[in-house]
From Swiss-Prot:
Alphabetical list of CDD domains matching this protein: RNAP_A
Coiled-coil residue windows: none
Name the UniProt record assigns to this protein: DNA-directed RNA polymerase subunit Rpo1C
Cited HAMAP family: RNApol_arch_Rpo1C
InterPro entries associated with the record: DNA-dir_RpoC_beta_prime (IPR045867), RNA_pol_Rpb1_5 (IPR007081), RPO1C (IPR012757)
Reactions performed catalytically: RNA(n) + a ribonucleoside 5'-triphosphate = RNA(n+1) + diphosphate
EC number: 2.7.7.6
Complexes and interactors: Part of the RNA polymerase complex.
Length: 386
């Protein structure tokens, strides 16, 4: 049996293109040559596919909401340590689920899972080098003490040589970075730097102190810490903080697998389709972490709804809930008086096309048998049975 023969058999079937291709590849891989067996496999696949289809008029939104919401009541409310990674806090459970559906611009604990290229992933030293290049280093993180010297009227930085060496920096690098960010006169006394300004005063020195501490020396902005962990036969990096755009530019990073839990950042860097996949993955992982299983199609429906306009929108009054076409549906969700008052002022007419608004006015909803109109042929003969 050749691929062309299988394609011909599946050409007019109801199966989607991806399923057709996967089925063909599976039949060829198993080397099934008997035509009656191939026909039986195709028929059974079509029957199984048709059983999974949603019935016309099914309330898929309500079913999805119930299927996700009911297990959600069993979820924990706390922030946990990420399994197997020491000292790295990650928000899990219900708070994480709320973050996802609210499309928060910044998660409470942004993290990245950074995979390495083939040349780096098996070598601990190379993985450590990539981690050092990613981890953000500022003046404070390589200093033993940063304080205002009232006698000499300057800011004194006592550098930690061990920290400098471990992060691949020198005193000259620190001086150069400070000079590029601030107009200061720097006196170098081995590992002690004195920073002086033109018109010194206690107020002026104290004002500059936080800025000096925060001067960026090396690494990726917003990545506070990177942890290396060996999983099976490769090293994987876990970061505290997220900046996927800059991390992708670091040598040794596998851009095809590296990801972040910041969905809005994924949308900005990789696009809306990647953000949709991230929403599905994050919801599934959050539920799975609690030992809960929800059919992925319910999660896909939520993700599709959030991403349908090309940008990630929250499910709530500031997003999808507040953009419903029906005035009554918007009023029933939240901010009732605001929506009714605004609609009255503008003379809006509610077409009663949805579910909520029909329930409010006591009409049958367009769902299940309610979405079917029975049509009678008026030309039938009188007395003849239909």
């Amino acid at each position: 049996m050749q691929m062309a023969d299988l394609e011909k058999k599946l050409e007019n079937s109801v199966l989607p293109p991806l399923l057709k291709r996967e089925l063909s590849e599976k039949i060829l891989k198993e080397e099934i040559s008997e035509e009656y067996l191939v026909d039986e496999i195709i028929s059974e696949t079509i029957r199984a596919y048709e059983r999974t289809l949603v019935e016309p008029g099914e309330a898929v939104g309500v079913v999805a909401a119930q299927s996700i919401g009911e297990p959600g009541t069993q979820m924990t409310m706390r922030t946990f340590h990420y399994a197997g990674v020491a000292e790295l806090n990650v928000t899990l459970g219900l708070p994480r689920m709320i973050e996802i559906v609210d499309a928060r611009k910044e998660p409470s604990t942004p993290t990245m899972t950074i995979y390495l290229n083939d040349d780096f992933k098996g070598d601990r030293e190379k993985a450590s080098m990539v981690a050092k290049n990613i981890e953000s280093t500022n003046v404070e993180s390589v200093s033993e003490d940063i304080s205002v010297d009232l006698i000499n009227e300057c800011i004194t930085i006592v550098l930690n040589t061990h920290q400098l060496e471990s992060r691949g920096l020198t005193v000259a690098d620190v001086i150069e970075s400070i000079k590029s960010k601030m107009k200061l006169k720097i006196e170098d006394h081995e590992n002690v730097l004195n920073l002086k300004i033109k018109t010194p005063s206690l107020k002026a020195l104290r004002k500059r102190l936080p800025k000096v501490r925060a001067i960026h020396l090396k690494g990726v902005q917003n990545i506070k810490r990177v942890i290396i962990r060996k999983e099976v036969d490769e090293y994987i990096l876990y970061s505290e903080g997220s900046n996927i755009k800059e991390v992708f530019d670091i040598e040794g990073v596998d851009t095809t697998k590296t990801t972040t839990n910041n969905i809005v950042e994924i949308q900005d860097v990789l696009g809306i389709e990647a953000a949709r996949n991230a929403i599905i993955y994050e919801m599934d992982a959050t539920l799975g972490n609690q030992g809960l299983t929800v059919d992925k199609r319910h999660l896909m429906m939520v993700a599709d709804l959030m991403c349908t306009d090309g940008v990630v929108k929250p499910i709530g009054r500031h997003g999808i809930g507040g953009e419903k076409a029906s005035v009554l549906a918007r009023a029933a969700f939240e901010e009732t008086v605001k929506h009714l008052y605004s609609a009255s002022m503008r003379g809006y007419v509610d077409e009663l096309g949805g579910v909520v608004e029909n329930i409010i006015v006591g009409k049958p909803i367009a769902m299940g048998t309610g979405c079917i109109d029975v049509c009678i042929d008026k030309t039938y003969e009188e007395g003849k049975e239909l």
